[in-house]
Regions:
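Nucleic-acid enzyme cleavage-core boundary/entry regions
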Residues: 1-189, 201, 206-288
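Terminal interaction module
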Residues: 195-197
Length: 288
């Protein structure tokens, strides 16, 4: 019988604790039905010593180490190979937790030394543990991956004082978590700006980062001229995002300029994707 990580974790816990009774769930129901493990009494599965022996053998067909040895199922495949027979069965994504950077006028500070990454079309992935975080001087977080790859085409729209920043992709899933972790350990004096779609969802992303540490949001300098009928406006996208207005409106301590932008976006039903924001000219930086 082939078992997944969830089933193996459940079996490992029972073997570690030498548990004789467990609540029925999908895993134990399957093991009882397919392998006649345990006896069902009411809503529990009762395990004998011989049942535990069978479970230990079954566990050993998937895992090299004894059940008493704890390992991280989210580790990379090289680390997982020390424990799992099938190293591909882990939960880790190869690049899932790495931070993706690009730059024009900045070096990427690593613990092993500074790295030159300012080449057109070049992005660099690095784990947080290898970053010399204390040497990051300025950071711009970008929502869109394509914008990161093509940074050399549009960076001059960023205010001059921000053009020597490191540019970081916000990512999705585990990438987002890594970005949050970076923000938590950045030096307090390091300015951070967030450049997203010009819409409620983008403003919400920036606002959530601001809960971790103070950040600014980059918006089109011409934001006041963007109305519902603007050729780059996506009204239907605004409708999909209307749920975010309540959370944003309830944010305490929001700056007056940020309130004005939020009011404008909501009143005019604005949703301009970042690629289209890029067509609108210079950006301005607004403290949240």
């Amino acid at each position: 019988m082939r078992l997944g990580q969830r089933e193996l974790s459940i079996i490992q816990t029972v073997l570690q604790l030498k548990t004789r009774g467990v609540k029925l769930n999908k895993t134990w129901t399957m093991l009882n039905k397919d392998m006649q493990i345990g006896s069902i009494i009411k809503r529990e599965l009762h395990l004998s010593e011989s049942d535990l022996d069978v479970l230990r053998v079954l566990y050993g067909k998937h895992v090299k180490t004894e059940p008493e040895v704890t390992y991280d199922s989210n580790a990379d495949r090289i680390s997982l190979a020390d424990h799992r027979i099938d190293e591909k069965s882990g939960n880790a994504s190869v690049f899932g937790e790495q931070l993706w950077f690009a730059a024009i006028n900045a070096q990427l500070p690593l613990k092993s030394g500074e790295m030159h990454i300012a080449h057109p079309g070049v992005t660099t992935a690095v784990s947080l543990e290898h970053l010399a975080v204390e040497k990051i001087r300025k950071l711009i977080i970008i929502e869109n991956g394509t914008m990161l790859v093509r940074i050399s085409d549009w960076y001059q729209q960023v205010p001059l004082e921000w053009q020597d920043s490191l540019f970081l992709y916000r990512g999705h899933g585990k990438n987002c978590r890594s970005v949050n972790q970076l923000l938590e350990v950045l030096p307090e004096e390091c300015p951070v700006a967030v450049y997203t779609d010009f819409d409620l969802y983008g403003l919400n992303i920036a606002n959530n980062f601001n809960l971790i540490r103070p950040v600014s949001v980059m918006v089109p300098q011409c934001w006041q001229s963007i109305k519902e009928q603007h050729p780059d406006n996506n009204f239907y996208k605004y409708v999909d995002q209307s749920e975010y207005i309540s959370d944003l409106s309830e944010t305490e301590g929001m700056s007056e300029p940020m309130k004005a932008i939020l009011k404008h976006v909501n009143f005019n039903k604005v949703a301009v994707m970042q690629e289209n924001v890029n067509r609108l000219g210079p950006l301005v930086c607004i403290a949240i």
